[in-house]
Amino acid sequence: TDLTDLLKLKNYIDKIENKKFKSFMLIAFADAIKPVSLMERQSLKPYISKKYPKQTKTVRESFEYSFNAHYSAISGMSSYKTGVNGIKWIGFDASKFTRPDVAIDIAITSPPYINALDYTRCVKIEGALCGCINNAIAKDMRKVQIGHENRKNTIINKMVEDLFEPYFEHIKVYDIGRAKTCLAYFNDMYNNLSCVYNVLRMGGEYHIIIGDNTIKKVKIPTHEIIAAMATKIGFKWFGYYKYK
């Protein structure tokens, strides 16, 4: 069966002694899991779609595709940056980090959507099969997951509260908990904007890939609110590209 083949492949990977090679193979393995299963690959929805039946791949087909895709990506990156010191971690909480000794030219991110989707749950199967996540680790991950409902009782910046107040008042009519979660999301994004602003060089740019949402029948112009917060911090909004 596919599950048996996945476990056999994982067993072979576990026997690799070189840590870098093993890490790369585990990444390729993790990315190969969903195409083999009935889970959706291009969606983070934690359920199986009955409307659009999925054509699955064999373990070999999926792993070979994943391996080649990641090898191509890492080769491309290596052509721009070489050496063991090519990557420098500057924090593990996107809403709370500071590095006065680090200066960057450009930051690019695609933050979570405001709908509080449990991203940790969506990657839990891959993490479990790779042996790098359990319930305790998942719980800790959710504590620092921007936009997660666990952060809805955090202390909110007054400026953020004022910006989101019109939407907050409409959402709370339907669900006060969701309204607080949305408010906490923008508070997290405000903190992230502040952190990134402080590590950007003069003239540096921050590119954010984000989508607007409708929460409890209330349309939220997420990109406009983030832009307004960024402007108050000191950023200059040079435009946006919108597509449907």
Where does each model-flagged region fall?
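Acceptor-substrate binding/catalytic loop of class I
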Residues: V123, R178-N187, I209-E224
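Flexible loop/turn segments at secondary-structure boundaries
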Residues: K96-F97, N115-L117, T214-V218, K244
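Helix-to-beta-strand junctions that scaffold the AdoMet/dcAdoMet cofactor pocket
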Residues: L200-M202
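SAM-dependent nucleic-acid methyltransferase catalytic core
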Residues: D2-T109, I114-R121
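Short glycine-centered segments of the SAM/dcSAM-binding site in methyltransferase folds
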Residues: F24, G204-E205
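SAM-dependent methyltransferase catalytic-core segment centered on the flexible catalytic loop
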Residues: I114-C195
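Short alpha-helix
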Residues: N191-S194, P221-I233
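Class I S-adenosyl-L-methionine
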Residues: M229, I233-K244
